[in-house]
Amino acid sequence: MAETLSGLGDASAAGAAAVSSAASETGTRRLSDLRVIDLRAELKKRNLDSSGNKSVLMERLKKAIEDEGGNPDEIEVTSECNKKMPKRPSKGRKPEDEGVEDNGLEENSGDGQEDVETSLENLQDMDMMDISVLDEADIDNGSVADCVEEEEEATLPEGLADSTELVEGDLKGLPEQLQEHAIDDKDTVNNVDTSSSDFTMLQEMEEASLEPENEKILDILGETCKSEPVKEEGSELEQPFAQATSSVGPDRKLAEEEDLFESCGHPEEEEEEEEEDQEEEQEEEGDLALASSSKSESPSTRCQWSEADAPLAVVKREPADAPGGGTGMDREPVGLEEPVEQSSTAAQLPEATSQELVRAPTAALSPEPQDSKEDVKKFAFDACNDVPAPPKESSASEGADQKMSSVEEDSDTKRLSREEKGRSSCGRNFWVSGLSSTTRATDLKNLFSRYGKVVGAKVVTNARSPGARCYGFVTMSTAEEATKCISHLHKTELHGKMISVEKAKSEPTGKRVPDRRDGDSKKEKASTSDRSANLKREEKGERKDDAKKTDDGSTEKSKDADDQKPGPSERSRTTKSGSRGTERTVVMDKSKGVPVISVKTSGSKERASKSQDRKSASREKRSVVSFDKVKESRKSRDSESRRERERSEREQRLQAQWEREERERLEIARERLAFHRHRLERERMERERLERERMHVEQERRREQERIHREREELRRQQELRYEQERRPAVRRPYEVDGRRDDAYWPEAKRAALDDRYHSDFSRQDRFHDFDHRDRGRYPNHSVDRREGSRSMMGDREGQHYPERHGGPERHGRDSRDGWGYGSNKRLSEGRGLPPPPRRDWGEHGRRLEDDRAWQGTADGGMMERDHKRWQGGERSMSGHSGPGHMMNRGGMSGRGSFAPGGASRGHVIPRGGMQAGFGGQSRGSRPSDARFTRRY
């Protein structure tokens, strides 16, 4: 307890500032004082989600506590592991693992006792690959040395569960009295055994289906921590089979030979046979005591193979120094081999050994011991050359039989004692849960050493889940001491925490470090088991060395046969590295005098065979098959390979022919497709050509239709024009000749005279091009004629009134007749007796022409009708003015009668002037008014 208290003091000194109370005490704390790890532990205890930051966790926990009816300000928190654990980084544990271990160590800390039991159940179910060794105690006394090595071997890769039977063979191989000679290889042996035991436990936790096998293994591995030396597997397995097969007889051996040959490729059947052989071997344990007479020879053998093995089994440690270390130093450690070669089949070796040993007596009893066994050895590599050769073969050395039988008997006695110990070791291991974070492996060792010898103590945790609890795994020297510890220390207090001690369920001693990956663990598992197998094989080789100095001839012969085997190349290479005279041995049973077993003891060959997988077991059984069967199998194999070759060639030919035909078919199909493609292309081009022609014809037809349409439109337009032109004269009002003739003021003579004068020799066609000459005959311009007539009459009158200006009426009439030549004045003067019009000068005549031209420009369209109306109106108005005042009015109207009085006569000037302005412009006002009109009115 002093150590415990000191450890606790160190821990509290290092971490008191961080933790409010001792790490293992239960206290009431406020919710706000809890760390994230405490919050997560409380949430996990309530099966709530523990992810998120601190505020989320506090809110979640507070809600949960309020739902439970508790007070969030007073929470009972049990700290299980202190963050400030002053522990050294132990083997297999990195410094950063401490933090990982601390996280969550306070979870499940509600009520300690239930948590302890629950954690124990969880621990039994924990995946062994996840267990990390936090601390382990170094136990230095002699009987415990191997357990120290076993615990330090925790850093070795896991996975010797499959090779536990091999380890069993090693443990059973030598008698207990050799312990004093075997101290030198204790480290090696214990490394192999403890690792295998640990890995067995690991395998058990991972695969529940392997539990029966693991329980068997537990018996084997029980002695790991009792410093039981490794015993020879071959010898241990040989004796019971020797007795069994010697009593059976040759017939059964031949049947077993055939069974072996049939089961060449069936490793599963071989495993079953191996289990049956082990049961048989256990039944015959009682008879094995007979062999104890030859124990004296075994120590030297033990020493020599163990020394050869020392460099093999220790992976991370140097071999321990031991008192008997010098005994076998003159021997060469032929067991050394790369782990790759050893890695896969070590677990097969016990099965292989047992089954091969069952069949071996047949070869030993055969009438031609040497040749047949060499052939058997050849068969082991020829008949099944697809798998590595067996590590054991029969030998024809009769001289070595006596010596080897004693070794065999020794190994059987050792196996018996070791099995008893293994059965007693089932209950030596127990778990300790509920540990404080300050508890170290030395504390556990000191605590449990009160009730017995502590073989191993470790503090482990689940490395895969951060913040997992810490557990202790303790191995006592005997099951009784373990039971005593459990009864005395279960539900007791350690470092302020209630610990629970419970027996490990069918688990061998020690936990594993899960730091390595599964692949590495499997590889290393196989390699460690291979090393233990190497120890056994080398021991046999060395024993053969001593026993068989005279057997060189047969040995050379067998080695030649070995060299021409079809096994792997490294097998023959390693075979030569061993001693050349120790290839095979025939072991004789002295009590019965019959050859019991044939052992192939070339260490290098054994090593090479270990590089294969489980199938190597079947090869060991095949070592007793006769040479005839070898030849037979070779012939059948050759014929089968020949048949296979012919079949493959035939298939290739058929395939080639089929491919050729397929190519031809494809070519024909391609040509047909190309032809179709060309035909379709031609048809498409023809269709396109026809389409183009059709489009062209369509365009032509459309153009023709448009042309016809245009012509039709043109014709229609012309017809409409003609119709319009024909219709236009009917719309215009023609000149009413009769109506004008009826007019009192415009007699017929005047109209005719005007008409004749208009159409006289004075040609006006060239002057007025805007007139339509066709229509002139229809409605002549009477306005012009009228104006002309009026002017002529006015001129006549002016000539009468102003003879001094005009020169008399005669001269004026003559001039007007000569100058104008219209004949109208003559007719007028003839018809009415009017005097001839006054003579006009050419200036006035030019003015009149100008006026006429201007009037003609405005006379188109309906103007003529309006002019006719106005002329008629004017004439009528003029005709209405009778009386003498009219002369003056007209004179004044023409602009010349300035002497006429204004007065009422002005009203008559306005229409006349307006009429003149409408037709002639302003120049008309200067024309002289004809004075002759006065006589008419």
Curated annotation (Swiss-Prot):
Q: Where is the composition biased (Basic and acidic residues)?
A: 225-234, 370-380, 412-423, 499-573, 581-592, 603-661, 771-818, 838-854, 863-873, 927-937
Short sequence motif named Nuclear localization signal, residue ranges: 621-638
Phosphothreonine, modified sites: T188
Compartments (UniProt record): Nucleus
The UniProt record lists the SAP domain at 31-65
Question: Which residue spans adopt a coiled-coil conformation according to this UniProt entry?
Answer: 652-726
Where Omega-N-methylarginine occurs, residue numbers?
R832
* Descriptive protein name: Scaffold attachment factor B1
Q: Where does this protein have compositionally biased stretches of type Low complexity?
A: 11-24
Q: Which residues carry this modification: Asymmetric dimethylarginine?
A: R890, R896, R906, R912
Q: Quaternary arrangement and interactors, per the entry?
A: Monomer and homodimer. Forms heterodimers with SAFB2. Interacts with KHDRBS3. Interacts with CLK2. Interacts with POLR2A, ASF/SRSF1, SRp30c/SRFS9 and TRA2B/SFRS10. Interacts with SRPK1 and inhibits its activity. Interacts with RBMX. Interacts with FUS. Interacts with ZBED4.
Compositionally biased tracts (Polar residues)? 341-356
Q: Where is the composition biased (Acidic residues)?
A: 67-77, 98-117, 268-287
For the cross-link Glycyl lysine isopeptide (Lys-Gly) (interchain with G-Cter in SUMO), the position is K231, K316
Keywords annotated in UniProt: Acetylation, Coiled coil, DNA-binding, Isopeptide bond, Methylation, Nucleus, Phosphoprotein, Repressor, RNA-binding, Transcription, Transcription regulation, Ubl conjugation
Instruction: Give the originating organism.
Output: Mus musculus (Mouse)
Q: Which residues carry this modification: Phosphoserine?
A: S24, S55, S79, S195, S197, S209, S405, S406, S437, S602, S604, S623, S626
- Biological-process GO terms, alphabetical: estrogen receptor signaling pathway; hormone metabolic process; positive regulation of transcription by RNA polymerase II; regulation of growth
Q: Which residues carry this modification: N-acetylalanine?
A: A2
Q: Where is this region: Interaction with POLR2A?
A: 550-814
Span list, region Interaction with SAFB2? 621-937
Cross-link Glycyl lysine isopeptide (Lys-Gly) (interchain with G-Cter in SUMO1): where in chain: K600
Taxonomy, superkingdom: Eukaryota
Which InterPro entries has this protein been placed in? Nucleotide-bd_a/b_plait_sf, RBD_domain_sf, RRM_dom, SAF_Modulators, SAFB1_2_RBD, SAP_dom, SAP_dom_sf
The gene is Safb
Record-level Gene Ontology MF annotations: chromatin binding; RNA binding; RNA polymerase II cis-regulatory region sequence-specific DNA binding
Which region ranges are annotated with the description Disordered?
1-35, 64-117, 222-429, 499-661, 684-738, 771-937
